[in-house]
């Protein structure tokens, strides 16, 4: 019981009571922790303001958008003021605006001293929120560290994407592969991993190759994830 009182959980599914109001969902959950009603009431007011749902206090849950339900589920997980909050895929299914609002709320929790444990398939989410992360493949840990340290260890500084007309890439694949320390030839584009994007682009053009489009970007955690786990879809 003592450990549970310091722990908050946000499941992947928003298992809220659809027939109850936003306020009543939080009140009922607070009672599970045997908190006095006065304490719960004060906490609800704080949490609704924190997750930007104050004006939805009297609304039934089934009238809320997906993003609002997700924020309410997080508020519910915080009702007992936990020191540790566990979140399972916190932004799955949300639009970009709702995701960024949620990230902002979670970042503020970190600033307040709450420890977050997050499972996610969104690498940009892990890069935004995590101080330390574990990448797993087939139930095994394949890498561990801070987002920046993993990127520096497993990916060169930049990635250049070259797109060629249909049928051309297959013919020039071998020539492309030797123009950077590491490369990937995909169905629709070639990815060249390099520490100097401009130099790599110059090498490609010097070879007489004429891509339709060229995109240079910094390496990301997603590049690391794909390198360590592969691009083949697995169950």
Regions found by a protein language model. Give the residues of each.
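ABC transporter nucleotide-binding domain
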Residues: 103-195
């Amino acid at each position: 019981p003592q450990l549970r009182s310091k722990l908050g959980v946000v499941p992947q599914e928003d298992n809220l009571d659809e027939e109850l109001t936003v306020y009543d969902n939080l009140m009922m959950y607070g009672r599970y922790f045997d908190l006095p009603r006065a304490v719960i009431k004060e906490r609800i007011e704080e949490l609704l303001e924190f997750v930007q749902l104050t004006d939805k206090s009297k609304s039934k849950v089934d009238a809320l958008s997906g993003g609002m339900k997700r924020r309410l589920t997080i508020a519910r997980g915080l009702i007992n003021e936990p020191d540790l909050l566990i979140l399972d895929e916190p932004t799955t299914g949300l639009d970009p605006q709702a995701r960024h609002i949620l990230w902002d709320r979670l970042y503020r929790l970190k600033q307040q001293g709450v420890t977050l444990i997050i499972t996610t398939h969104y690498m940009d989410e892990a890069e935004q929120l995590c101080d330390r992360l574990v990448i797993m493949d087939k139930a095994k840990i394949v890498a561990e560290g801070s987002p920046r340290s993993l990127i520096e260890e497993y990916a060169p500084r930049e990635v250049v994407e070259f797109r060629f007309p249909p049928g051309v890439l297959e013919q020039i694949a071998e020539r492309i592969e030797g123009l950077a320390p590491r490369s990937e030839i995909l169905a629709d584009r070639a990815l060249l991993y390099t520490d100097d994007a401009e130099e790599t682009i110059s090498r490609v053009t010097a070879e007489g190759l004429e891509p339709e489009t060229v995109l240079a970007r910094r390496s990301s955690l997603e590049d690391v994830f794909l390198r360590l786990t592969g691009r083949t879809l697995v169950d």
